[in-house]
Regions:
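Short alpha-helical transmembrane segments in multi-pass integral membrane proteins
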Residues: 1-19, 76-143, 189-245, 301-366, ...
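Residue-level signal for short hydrophobic patches within transmembrane helices
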Residues: 8, 12-31, 35, 57-64, ...
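Transmembrane helical elements of multi-pass membrane transporters/channels
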Residues: 17-36, 137, 171, 204-208, ...
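Helix-terminus/linker motif at the lipid-water interface of multi-pass membrane proteins
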Residues: 27, 31-49, 118-125, 181-192, ...
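Residue-level hotspots within pore-lining transmembrane alpha-helices
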Residues: 28, 32, 61-65, 105, ...
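Small-residue-rich hydrophobic transmembrane alpha-helices
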Residues: 48-108, 145-159, 163-164, 262, ...
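Hydrophobic transmembrane alpha-helices of multi-pass small-molecule transporters
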Residues: 60-63, 107, 175-180, 209-213, ...
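Short runs within selected transmembrane alpha-helices of multi-pass transporters and secretion channels
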Residues: 69, 73, 138-156, 164-172, ...
Length: 444
């Protein structure tokens, strides 16, 4: 199929056609996480706390899969823009192979690390038991998950956003249906508790990958994924890793941040860890929507930059900025206006809801501020400038927020951690805006 529509179709309709399917799929994934957490919370608050403690390691593994997928996406889209179809085929094939290898490595490392990781934050044996049970079961599916992410990014790189949306919806649908059946033992299924939540997740991931494999067999992509092209090439792998490692670190920084914040909050009470975990489930709904726009934007920027359409790259950036700004404004309003309702989805304990209300109202203004950073970071990835994207994420998730959270928590208590979010977003937005302005002046 001819990909020239990426540089010929009007920018806003094109971005929406690329972005909306991904937004739907990303929001569906975030909603699944929320629904899954609600079911887990029905087991007990200990189970919910265990999920919050496990989340950083789970997110780290997810970051490795998605981050490398971003490298695949950027390189395939760029080679297609340059008219190098054979190299695009090699990139896609080698990307799928390496993603499977990454999944195997993640399974081994995750199983080895998780017992020690959990004991860093709690000595409660019930919470530790819940965490180990969930983690060890869900990580059995890591290879399937990383391969599914690789196929998703290949399909997105050629503009097949509706296909990737369908795959995510299938996986989430299977997951949500199986969650109550496996967790609570409906019908002939025995009650599996938190183990059931893990197996529902893994089976959903398997369903998504099977959808891609069957579809690609029945109706092959114009980018060919084949065994004969899977032998790693230094040039191709280097290109994928140069973007993929930076993108992985971008997303893995969330795990670093959560681990650090859990350590800061743990001396006050485990309730604060639970609230932080709930916040991250809720904010995922917002940022996954924004990520959908970025994923629609990224191949468009990569293709048009490769095709020498610099002015069109700038137009795509502006359109994406406008859309994400609307999403983030909506998120800020929800956090300010209905925090009790949002917290009440996960717990009915009055003291926990009160702490969550304070957290959401203090953190929410940072959503609007983060628009600049989110779009600039994604645009840099699309241009193959992974290091610039990484610098922005380092500021958002480590260099600024962690020291501020630590210092403020010592001065005003755990509330200081919530203030650190919006302060970090404000400072990073100024830097990201200036960095993008310099880039378009020099490179575009």
């Amino acid at each position: 199929m001819d990909q020239t529509y990426m540089k010929e179709k009007p920018v806003v309709p094109l971005l929406l056609s690329m972005g909306i399917p991904v937004i739907i799929s990303m929001i569906a994934g975030a909603l699944y996480n929320i629904v899954d957490s609600i079911f887990v919370a029905m087991i007990s608050e200990d189970a919910m706390t265990a999920g919050s403690l496990v989340y950083p390691i789970q997110n780290l593994a997810h970051a490795a899969g998605v981050g490398f997928g971003v490298g695949i996406n950027a390189m395939v889209a760029g080679r297609l823009g340059e008219g190098k179809t054979r190299m695009a085929n090699q990139t896609a094939s080698q990307g799928v192979f390496l993603s499977a290898l990454h999944g195997m490595i993640l399974t081994i490392l995750g199983m080895a690390v998780i017992p020690y990781f959990l004991r860093m934050f709690t000595s409660d044996e019930v919470t530790i038991s819940y965490g180990l049970t969930y983690f060890c079961n869900v990580f059995l599916f890591s290879t399937i998950d990383t391969m599914g992410m690789a196929y998703e990014k290949v399909y997105q790189s050629v503009g097949k956003m509706k296909i990737s949306m369908a795959a995510v919806l299938i996986g989430c649908g299977v997951n949500i249906v199986l969650d109550p059946i496996f967790i609570f033992g409906l019908g002939p299924m025995p009650e599996l508790g938190i183990r059931g939540a893990a197996w529902a997740t893994g089976i959903g991931q398997t369903a998504s990958l099977l959808f891609y494999l069957i579809l690609n067999h029945v109706k092959p992509l114009n980018v060919e994924i084949s065994l004969r092209e899977m032998r790693p090439s230094k040039e191709i792998c280097g290109g994928m890793y140069s973007v993929g490692i930076a993108a992985t670190l971008n997303m893995a920084l969330t795990s670093l941040l959560l681990t650090a914040l859990n350590a800061i909050l743990a001396p006050f009470s485990q309730v604060y860890i639970l609230v932080l975990g709930v916040y991250y489930k809720l904010q995922a709904l917002l940022y996954q929507g924004a990520s959908g726009v970025v994923q629609g934007m990224r191949p468009l920027i990569g293709y048009n930059y490769g095709a020498g359409e610099q002015e069109r790259v700038k137009k795509i950036f502006r359109a994406a900025f406008m859309i994400v700004g609307i999403i983030m404004t909506a998120g800020t309003l929800l956090g300010e206006l209905v925090p009790d309702f949002l917290m009440g989805l996960f717990t009915q304990t009055p003291s926990t809801v009160e702490i969550g209300r304070t957290a959401l109202r203090l953190i929410s203004p940072g959503f609007v501020m983060s628009t600049v950073s989110v779009i600039a970071s994604g645009a840099f990835e699309g241009l193959g400038m992974g290091l610039k994207s990484l610098k922005i994420s380092l500021m958002r998730y480590a260099v600024i927020i962690i020291p501020i959270a630590f210092v403020l928590s010592r001065i005003i208590g755990p509330t200081g951690v919530w203030h650190a979010f919006w302060l970090a977003e404000l400072i990073t937005a100024v830097y990201a805006g200036a960095s993008w302005k310099r880039t378009i002046t020099v490179s575009l």
